């Protein structure tokens, strides 16, 4: 089981998702590493660690990319980070329960870039819906599917 690990792009990860991950790490005796450029409160546990990286653009992302392995799962809403994780053969799951895959990541990147271009030209595109109980449940279900394989 020591080959498996969960990484969290923790700066923007919703607290309810962190709580689910804390419980899963304890239940499965599975290493969980939260990477952020600020201190993140984590419960005392031999399985849960927090890595604080320096401030700067994508510093936490790069730390995760540098350390992830194919048997690992990365929790992130950052689509470019998810693409890098997939290139390294690992899995990426967003906090709303959607698994990023080789089959869908190019489309996700294209849509992200398109929306960014629209915003850059002054078009108001809105943001994602508020994080909901349904999102939390979808994440828990997706995580459980991965944990069954561990």
Swiss-Prot record:
Pfam families for this protein: DUF188
Disulfide bonds: none
Entry-linked InterPro entries: UPF0178 (IPR003791)
UniProt-listed PANTHER family: UPF0178 PROTEIN YAII
NCBIfam families, alphabetized: PRK00124.1
Protein family (similarity comment): Belongs to the UPF0178 family.
Protein name in the entry: UPF0178 protein Sbal_1771
């Amino acid at each position: 089981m020591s080959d498996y690990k969960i990484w969290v792009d923790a700066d923007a990860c919703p607290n309810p998702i962190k709580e689910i991950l804390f419980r899963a790490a304890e239940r499965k005796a599975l290493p969980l590493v939260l990477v952020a450029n600020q201190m993140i409160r984590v419960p005392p546990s031999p399985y849960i660690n927090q890595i604080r990286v320096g401030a700067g653009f994508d510093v936490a992302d790069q730390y995760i990319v540098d350390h992830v392995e194919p048997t690992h799962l990365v929790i992130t809403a950052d689509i470019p980070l998810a693409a890098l994780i997939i290139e390294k053969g690992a899995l990426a799951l967003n906090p709303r329960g959607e698994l990023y895959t080789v089959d869908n990541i190019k489309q996700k990147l294209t849509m992200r870039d398109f929306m960014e271009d629209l915003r850059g030209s002054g078009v108001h595109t809105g943001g994602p819906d508020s994080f909901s109980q349904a999102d939390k449940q979808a994440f828990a279900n997706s995580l459980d599917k991965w944990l069954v394989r561990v």
